[in-house]
Amino acid sequence: IVRDIDAARDHVHLLFYIWLPDGNGCKIAEALKRAAVRGVTCRVMADALGSRVLIASAHWKAMVDAGVHVAVALPIGIPLLRPLSGRLDLRNHRKIVVIDDRITYCGSQNCADPEFRVKPRYAPWVDAVVRFEGPIARQNQHLFAADWMAHVDDDIAEILRRPLPPAGPGLI
């Protein structure tokens, strides 16, 4: 993912349920900062609960300072008042990366080191992430755009109207 972010020319969109300020999480944040500084539009969204440690960290602020557009999915607000305004357990569990509308990653892997365990009694488990290239990236672009525009006053629908990049050789 870092290599693809470093090669991005137009935009990078990321959405993670859990994004931690650990080794892998910081590598992604650093790559996003580099991309934003060189003029790539970077939009990232992280779940308010699953990514709360990163969101409250200096890494999040450093991304903003570098020009990365950030959004928090499903803000919690004041936890004691949350039952009055909605369910705390409804979270955005997506893990999506879209780069230049031609590369996408998706799967069950959060943005965290492999050793990360939320609940040790359930671990170890195996997460997977798959890299796709070509027109299929547009599907994840739609998912990201829907979540982004639901939380941010930033209409990115124009990206969805662009011609699709040509498909390359694929595996059948």
Give the positions of each predicted feature.
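Charged, low-complexity intrinsically disordered terminal segments
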Residues: 1-172
